[in-house]
Regions:
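N-terminal helix-loop segment corresponding to the beta1-alpha1 unit
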Residues: 1-171
Length: 171
């Protein structure tokens, strides 16, 4: 049975949970998803527990149903490859701060200069404006800053074992 997103091509520049989970859900629905890692592989590949194959179990779960490649989008050859990939893609998924998107050529203006109807979906811990917009944040940071840890800890604040913020943001 064909998925509802069959024929849709997605470039996944997501890291850790929110981006990869979002792209993984789209892959589950039939989209062709290409996970693009930095040369040498993404740092989220090695989050424990590590499988016998050397990959983190979470990395394998987040990247199921995807193809993968490595790319340096800041090198001349990498920029050319990225341009060709964007020309053939429908959606780009990334969860990086705005400055990182711009430096990699993954910001909306750069992408639409290549393909006018490309869809860019991004998520960041602190949004694109404001004093924390360029900071990187993970689920435990959001839990702590929002007060959630105070609700789950007794007597001291405690992080929830599940990364609720990341998973809910991705969906």
């Amino acid at each position: 049975m064909a998925g509802v997103l069959e024929g849709v091509r997605i470039l996944d520049f997501g890291r850790y949970i929110a981006g990869p989970w979002c792209a993984g859900l789209l892959a589950d629905l039939g989209a062709e998803v290409i996970r693009v890692d930095k040369i040498g592989g993404g740092e989220d590949r090695f989050v424990v527990p590590i499988t016998d194959e050397g990959d983190g179990a979470m990395y394998q779960q987040m990247n199921r149903n995807k193809r993968g490649m490595t790319l340096n989008p800041t090198s001349p050859e990498g920029k050319e490859i990225l341009c060709r990939m964007v020309e053939r893609a429908d959606v780009v998924v990334a969860n990086l701060p705005e400055k990182a998107l711009v430096s990699l050529g993954l910001d909306y203006e750069s992408l639409t200069a290549i393909k006018s109807d490309i869809i860019l979906t991004t998520t960041t811990a602190f949004g694109t404006q404001g004093p924390f917009s360029e900071k990187i944040g993970f689920d435990p940071v959001a839990q702590g800053m929002s007060g959630l840890m105070h609700l789950t800890g007794y007597e001291e604040p405690m992080r929830s074992a599940a990364s609720w913020v990341d998973f809910n943001t991705a969906t």
